[in-house]
C-alpha cells in the first residue's frame, strides 16, 4: 500500500495537463489557467513541513490514511465546480493531501529499510510515483478528449488505496514514533535547492509542452501520451539508480534533463519532442531517489519526517514556480526557444555539479 500511495503523488497535479488547452478556452488562456495545475504544488510545498512534524509526532500511518481520504475528496471535487477560483481552492486542498502522502511514504520506507535496501526501495518509490504518470496521464488524455472535466474522476482511486492502507499497513518502528529535539542537518538545505531547480525545469513538461504540442497539431490524447513519456523513463531511471555509483548521479541526471529539454525546443517533430522528454525523464528518475537517500542518511530516525518533508517542499515549490519563472521567456522568445535556453543552462549546471563532485573526491 505504501508504493501504491506513491503512484498518486507526482501525477496529482499533472493529471489535468491534457485538459489545459480546453480550460484555456473556457476560462481564458493565461497564467491563471496554468496555476490550476501548479497551485497544487504550492500547497504541497507549504504543507509538507507541517506534515513532517505530524509524521514524527503522531505517526506515519495515521497521516497517510487521512491524507489519502482528503486526496480522493478534493481531487474529484474538481469535476463539479464551475468557476476558476473555486477550482483553484479544491486544487489547494489536494496539495495539502499530497504533502501528507509523500512525507509519510518517504518516512515509512526509510524507517523500514537500511543500507542498500533503503536505496533500492527509495528507487522503487520514485519508480512507482513515475509509473502513476505513465498509467494516469494517457488515460487523462483520452478522458479530456471527451470532456475536459472527466480526468478529475481519476483521483477517486485514492479511496481504494486508503482502505488498503487501513487494513494492511503494519505499525511503524518505535524510534520513528518518539521525536526528540536535535540539530537540523544544514547540508540538507543544498539538497532542497537542487531539488527545487531540477523540478522547476522538469515541470515545463506539463505546464508548457501541451501548448507547444497543440501548435504542432497534437490533440488531447496525444498530449497526454507524450507528456507521460517523461514519466515512463523516470521509472527506468529510478530502477537503474541503485546500481550506479551515487557520487555523480545528481549532476549527470540534471545534465540529461537539460539535454532533453534542448532537443524539445530545437525540433518541430512530435517524435523528437518525445525523444527529448524520454531523455529528460530518465535524468529526473536518477536525481530524485538519490537526493532522498542522501537526506535519509543525514537525518536521525526521530527527525526523518521533518527532514524528508523539506525535499517534498523543494520539489513542489519548483513545480509551482515553473510557469511563473518561464512566463517572461515565452512571450519574448516563444515556447520552443524557452525549452532550448532552459535546457542549455541546465546541462551546463549539471555538468559543473558532476565535475565539482569529482574534484572534491
Q: What function would you assign to each model-found segment?
A:
Residues 298-335, 342:
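A late C-terminal transmembrane helix in Major Facilitator Superfamily
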Residues 28, 59, 80-86, 114, ...:
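Helix-breaking motifs and short loop linkers at transmembrane-helix boundaries and internal kinks
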Residues 62-76, 248-263:
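Structural signature of the two symmetry-related core transmembrane helices
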Residues 70, 74, 85-94, 271-279:
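Paired small-residue
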Residues 48-59, 236-247, 330:
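Helix-to-loop junctions at the C-terminal end of transmembrane segments
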Residues 46-83:
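Conserved MFS/SLC helix-loop-helix module at the cytosolic interface between two early adjacent transmembrane helices
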Residues 115-120, 124-168:
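Helix-loop-helix hairpin linking two adjacent transmembrane segments in secondary transporters
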Residues 90-129:
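Cytoplasmic helix-loop-helix junction between adjacent transmembrane helices
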